[in-house]
UniProtKB/Swiss-Prot annotation:
Family: Belongs to the RxLR effector family.
UniProt protein name: RxLR effector protein SFI1
Motif range (RxLR-dEER): 40-58
Source organism phylogeny: Eukaryota, Sar, Stramenopiles, Oomycota, Peronosporales
Signal peptide: 1-22
Primary role: Effector that suppresses flg22-induced post-translational MAP kinase activation both tomato and Arabidopsis. The perception of highly conserved pathogen- or microbe-associated molecular patterns (PAMPs/MAMPs), such as flg22, triggers converging signaling pathways recruiting MAP kinase cascades and inducing transcriptional re-programming, yielding a generic antimicrobial response.
Subcellular location(s) per record: Secreted; Host nucleus, Host nucleolus
Domain of life the protein comes from: Eukaryota
Alphabetical keyword list: Host nucleus, Secreted, Signal, Virulence
Originating organism: Phytophthora infestans (strain T30-4)
Transferase keyword on record: no
One GO CC term on file: extracellular region
Amino acid sequence: MRSIFYVALAFAVLARSSSVEAFPNPKEPQLLSKASPDKRSLRVEGQEVVQGGTLDGNGGVWKAIAHTTNKIVKKPEIDVSKLIDVAKKAKKVKKLKNLMKLKKSSS
């Protein structure tokens, strides 16, 4: 019971301190605001703001990166069928080795 009280107290203190930072007192001088630029943009090139649908789980505005990554880094062309054949051969060799061990141990 006491631990719940301490958790609630810590939450209240953290919530109060973050809300104070979010809404500063307008009467206090704003020293840092003069040093920072007037307009800052954190958006990366190629990002666009998209309205999320109600069925996709986002329900609000979210950022989507434009599909330009394939132009920057090309995907290597790999023939997967060759890899599958090699894997099947390796599996057969492993089975044969296990059978050879079983024959030697049974003899």
